[in-house]
Amino acid sequence: MLRLAVATQQETFERIRDPLAVRDIEVVPVRASERTLSLSSPDLPSVDAGLVFPSRLMEGGAVSAALDVPWVNDREAILTSRNKAEVLAALSTAGVPTPETTLVSNPVDDDSVAAAAETLQTRTDTAELVIKPNSTTRGTGVARVADPDSLLGVTDYLDLVHDFRATGDRSFLLQEYLPDARDYRAMIVDGEYAGAVKRRLPEAETAAGKWKHNVHRGAVAEGVALSEAARELAERTADVLGIDYLGVDLLETDDRLVVNETNARPTVDDATKYEPGFYDRLAALIRKTAESR
């Protein structure tokens, strides 16, 4: 039986364990962070491949070196997808539609930020913008602003957080806000569409003024059948980025369909929300990865 190291969220581990077991793949948990690890004689399981490179790059690097196996999504794939600006620039250059976005390489002065926001608002003919840290996940630190004072207030907070945590990435994005956009997460496995969910907020949450569609922020993920255009867009995104196993976030309005973000560490949802052959294709990709060793 092939043994697969999994260092992703607990919910993904629980969901993929049994379906992969019946396909002769044993899912083995590997913890890369919040632990002690002897580098001289690391206490790690014997595995044939890994699913996705651990989220903490330093600890992940040590664990990956000790395991000495290929990953379905390696460090390069994780770094590429985590850099939202790089993803959007690559997709835009390849002709893949994305929201109008400006990268702010912090620190910059208030006048420069305000000028960039005004230019973006003029180009998109919209008053509201979304501001987000370039490397954020799960909607952390993402805000919606409609006036200069609110915008600069958010950047003030970003400056404080950056200084306190001495983070390596201080950049952030200014992005057009697409009101009433439908939010989808498409799953790509080995370059092909494998299913999708629509993420929506309960009506009570929307009525209360919430707008973020992240599941970890209270949104509900429902299995949907995407249009052919949306499927092709998600597949094209994975092809441009060169990432075999990818979550592609799509926003759709009445007249636009764009790629908003990607996730090379996607949470696996219930099997009923994916195409019937999802686990067969995932197992085949894992085996192909192990054979590349």
Model-found features: residue ranges?
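Conserved N-proximal alpha/beta basic substrate-recognition cap immediately N-terminal to
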Residues: 3, 7-107
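Short glycine-rich anion-binding loops that position phosphate/pyrophosphate groups of nucleotides
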Residues: 55-57, 134-136, 265
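Active-site nucleotide/adenylate-binding loops and adjacent lid/helix of ATP-dependent enzymes
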Residues: 80-172
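Protein kinase-like catalytic core scaffold
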Residues: 129, 194-195, 258-261
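Phosphate-binding site of ATP-dependent enzymes
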Residues: 140, 145-232, 237
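A short beta-strand motif that forms the metal-chelation/ATP-contact edge
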Residues: 186-188, 256-270
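A long amphipathic alpha-helix within ATP-dependent nucleotide-binding catalytic cores
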Residues: 208-256, 281, 285-293
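ATP-dependent carboxylate-activation loops
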Residues: 269-278
